């Protein structure tokens, strides 16, 4: 029962049987349309962003498993805010403001790869990334917003 793994980078939600997927998976003789459909379903949340995809194929049974990685937190934040670059001077130059609901959305997208045990801690991790990007969170310094999360100010938004 030999398994092969193919790792590729695709645009979320828009994989096609053509390159880079087709040439990489074609030699294994698996149903390409089934693979493409599953990749597109699993990566739909990351539409427009490059996402790492890992396809594990059993050579004997032609069965496959698809694992979708997540883009870096900085990429998700920039996509949500529609900005192209973070600040060159994060402490002095604030380039955008991340609303708490978008911080929660990003924390949910990244939750499996974050170190957080719950969404509250995940949102704080996303806010920590905002510090190094030169962003404010809900109009405040991200460190202040993290303190507000600890104090329970956003509990109504952060409910499961």
UniProtKB/Swiss-Prot annotation:
Record GO biological process: translation
GO terms, molecular function: large ribosomal subunit rRNA binding; structural constituent of ribosome
A GO CC annotation given for this chain: large ribosomal subunit
UniProt feature, compositional bias: Basic and acidic residues: 138-160
Segments of this protein annotated with the region Disordered: 137-160
Pfam families: Ribosomal_L11, Ribosomal_L11_N
Keywords of the record: Ribonucleoprotein, Ribosomal protein, RNA-binding, rRNA-binding
Entries under NCBIfam families matching the protein: PRK01143.1 (NF002232)
Function: Forms part of the ribosomal stalk which helps the ribosome interact with GTP-bound translation factors.
Protein family membership: Belongs to the universal ribosomal protein uL11 family.
Subunit structure: Part of the ribosomal stalk of the 50S ribosomal subunit. Interacts with L10 and the large rRNA to form the base of the stalk. L10 forms an elongated spine to which L12 dimers bind in a sequential fashion forming a multimeric L10(L12)X complex.
Name this polypeptide is given: Large ribosomal subunit protein uL11
Organism (species): Methanobrevibacter smithii (strain ATCC 35061 / DSM 861 / OCM 144 / PS)
Organism lineage: Archaea, Methanobacteriati, Methanobacteriota, Methanomada group, Methanobacteria
